């Protein structure tokens, strides 16, 4: 999957209780104990067929669950939370997909339609496919400001704090509480521009089976599997 088109619905979870469902404007804000029930409801309402020759993803929810999402399953370990700029959940519902198969060098345009009025929706789907085809053939380039760091990266944890985590992890392993632990130390820096060009360079110089670029109103995320 290399591209998706036209958001139908945006689902955002901003805190332990607040859940927002909006389509270009806020439709509703409500409280949830765990977001997964509402997300599962949306998925059940937007099922699509798996067709031979099509990619595994032909439409649905795209986005991220932040690290802090774990608190909905284990609220007892929430403490000293720091705002890292991410919502707990940001998911966008898409019914149109522009899929580029890098291996086959093949472009696939996909439009999902509802079955409530099949003939009417089919004609609408054909029109939307023609519109996607027109957009691609126009070759309109979007200027993207390259990423520029305004300062050096700084770690969230000091060397002493990180070493303490390592020692604590070793103790937990010795005591039999855990058998493996993956520690990390997030780096941060002020920057301007977009991650998109950085993602394109990464995709060219270090192609990986798992790569991603995601952008919403206030967040950009890009990455690749290390192997």
Task: Kindly label every feature range from the protein language model.
Residues 1-227:
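Extended alpha-helical targeting/anchoring segments
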